[in-house]
């Protein structure tokens, strides 16, 4: 943010001259109410104890020192010492060439330089197609990866393939039961069972490829069904994610943890740290020492590993790969698992290096009516179906339209409407509207001036200045979205910028004004279009030129 950087620079110089240290809790940000100016700061109050002065007296000192700054038009003091800054029009006008010169790099920063982050997301069991809930986690994870890379982090995106354990056995059994039923055998459905139509399809494919399977034992047949089902479903998942423009750099197999002896290596490490012990033939994690209400089993007395054991070994492997920060994106139903996993990471000597983001449920609606879903019962809307119906852009934007730990209502009919009530259309149409103005200008023989020749001083009305001020916030919004692991703030920002553009468009006849004003407005609109496109790119959403 250019305005914030300017204030940090000039205030930093004043503090240095006075022998004061920059206060840790000093905040510079746009005020909630625009009547207080362009930026506000609490720095005078944060300096009071250090400077041994009344906050208002400090504010008055700063106000006096800034008198004559060519970019700061006015400094007001409010209440006990809040500082409110109003910048000159020329300051905002100078932002436009910066936006257009940087182009696709406008808003990019290096705050994450030399920090290696792994983001693990989706990681759905390969037991069925991806559903709408997985789609929300996929959009969130992919958007976070884009934002982190945009702000300078070294990022790796990973999918954890749960290809070991009980759910895979249930998948194999489900396919085997359906296969036998299709051949006239009187087999009852087991209690734990996947019932979707895709199971019948997989059963038919297994039979076609293994005509002798009906003569095999249950164990042999289930093993074949399990492996075939897992491989086919995983290929389908990869295909769906590719169509959704979601990237994973690594597909990590849970099975590999056992075959590579990584689980036992982690157990040995925990024992060496005094965080695991044997009792009653089982291996336990001493999680009570780290705040858990009870110790947790890692290996049962019968030798079977718990899910928790694999998860600890998996995270141990992540840190051994050199990641400074590990981000896990989980469904909200895993919230109770977080303290246990945080304790395990701490036991491995990596306290504070795990961030968990929870993704709440999606309520899928059609014309205001909720669509009932159940994965086990086979009644669910697949991600593929939703994307095919409403499009990738609409799906991604809707998934990112609210904070991830908030429930999301996704109305399939609403996002197909070409109206301003549709949030996806509202933002994309702002970009398309600018492109339409550019085409009309060309049709009328109006040329867009070169950046350095544009008469930007003609941009002085409130709507024009508001667009410039909002564009200035983009880099800060992107940085905060990455630092706080909150991709949804990008969609909030884009709606604000789109709203300002639509307001400007409705209040001013862009191509019916003084020649200099028209020229300056066209360059301004180019900068707004670039900022919108950069923001939409972070969401993985296109910026159409017409709609």
UniProtKB/Swiss-Prot annotation:
Q: Which domain of life is it from?
A: Bacteria
What are the alphabetically sorted keywords of the record? Aminoacyl-tRNA synthetase, ATP-binding, Cytoplasm, Ligase, Nucleotide-binding, Protein biosynthesis
Write out the catalysed reaction.
tRNA(Arg) + L-arginine + ATP = L-arginyl-tRNA(Arg) + AMP + diphosphate
PROSITE patterns from the xrefs? AA_TRNA_LIGASE_I
Q: Which GO terms describe its cellular component?
A: cytoplasm
Q: Which GO terms describe its molecular function?
A: arginine-tRNA ligase activity; ATP binding
* Span(s) of short sequence motif 'HIGH' region: 124-134
InterPro entries found in the cross-reference section: aa-tRNA-synth_I_CS, Arg-tRNA-ligase, Arg-tRNA-synth_N, Arg-tRNA-synth_N_sf, ArgRS_core, DALR_anticod-bd, Rossmann-like_a/b/a_fold, tRNAsynth_Ia_anticodon-bd
Grouped into one coarse class, the protein's main location is: cytoplasm
Entry EC number(s):
6.1.1.19
CDD domains in UniProt:
Anticodon_Ia_Arg (cd07956), ArgRS_core (cd00671)
| Location(s) in or outside the cell | Cytoplasm
GO annotation (BP), single: arginyl-tRNA aminoacylation
Q: Which PANTHER family match?
A: ARGININE--TRNA LIGASE, CYTOPLASMIC (PTHR11956:SF5), ARGINYL-TRNA SYNTHETASE (PTHR11956)
Which family is this sequence assigned to? Answer: Belongs to the class-I aminoacyl-tRNA synthetase family.
Q: Subunit structure, per the record?
A: Monomer.
Q: What is this protein called?
A: Arginine--tRNA ligase
